Amino acid sequence: MNHLRAHILLAAALCINTLHAQSSDSAIVSILQQKDVVFTHNNKVVLLPSGKEKFEDMFKAIAQAKSSVHLEYFNFRNDSIASALFDLLKQKASEGVEVRALFDGFGNDSNNKPLRKEHIDSLRAHGIEIYEFDPIRFPWVNHVFLRDHRKIVVIDGNVAYTGGMNVADYYLHGTEQVGEWRDMHCRIEGGAVSPLQMIFLKLWNRVTEQDIWGPKYFRAYKPTEIHGLRPDTTSTAGHKKVGIINREPRISNDIIRVFYTEAINAAQDSIKLINPYLTLNRKLKKALRNAAKRGVKVEIMVSAKSDIPLTPDCVFYNVHKLMKKGVHVWLYQPGFHHTKVIMVDGKFCTVGSANLNARSLSWDYEENAVIIDKPTTRQLDQMFDNDKQKSVYLTPETWDAFRTPWQKFRGWFAHLLTPFL
């Protein structure tokens, strides 16, 4: 019996040593591959860290489309940038390009400049196929769950855009409420475009009851015929390893949670995290505490301002608790940081649509690009470090100056509602 116990303990020790010997990027790839995530190795990735850069680059790409333009957004806010986009899409449709667009019913209804029936009818009259995903009809309020929160654009099957931005003027000009609106998007060329196209077409066919498929939509390995875009100037351009994690309710429920939790658990040196709605769950809180405890430098950036009520109270409550466990917390001051990124050990990162709240972790349709690439991660690390210059470092003293006793109580109360935020 003692022999058996000794063998079991030895085997466990070997497993632990092997896990710690494995680099964090290798570990996360292995874990995601077990969840059927496919990584391709021939990608270019260009970060687009502002609305101006995203829309300028994307409009240039759409203007050169030859075959198809597919768009999937939580919402198209009916303002000037959406009007400019739709004018461009009308032009492409008149040239014979297939233009398809999806938007979420709740995302549309919950913004203050929604697309109305007359707008949709006009777009269809100009050759744009546009459909609303799961419209909300009274009294079926249960439909506020399982929303499509993705942000995907695929052009000619070989250029894709994804990240945290919808289509709205405030990505360019900010808002009176919060000021500057910061966010992150990226452009991908290479094999990782095909999974994004598959995600779009699967939902498109479900919503429209069409059967759109075939090789013309999957041209990720063919040379890009779109020119004049912002180049990938890194040493790894065309050789980046990228996987797409797709949260689809009832099919891949836990993929976002698994990625973030295991990325944090795998970290050996550093974690830098920006997320606007950091309500977290128990596993993520525990992972962050444990990372700090084992000597990983954990840095989190959240906005001092927010676009919605209650959720930020929970966020501030969480980061204060984490601060007391050794996590470095920064409160971004100039505006609202809507960015959703994590960078680990300077080796890998993610850019995508997923927040770290109950909706993204447990309910909504989401997708993120996981980028296993040091130069791209370094670019995001540099952005984080630059933004620290515009932020307040959280300490017991700055916490007391930042939050009144009433606000602290409100945060405690809000954290009780975490499963619903």
Predicted regions and their residues:
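N-terminal secretory signal peptides that target proteins for export/translocation
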Residues: 1-3
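Bacterial N-terminal signal peptides
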Residues: 7-17
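Charged, low-complexity intrinsically disordered terminal segments
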Residues: 6, 19-421
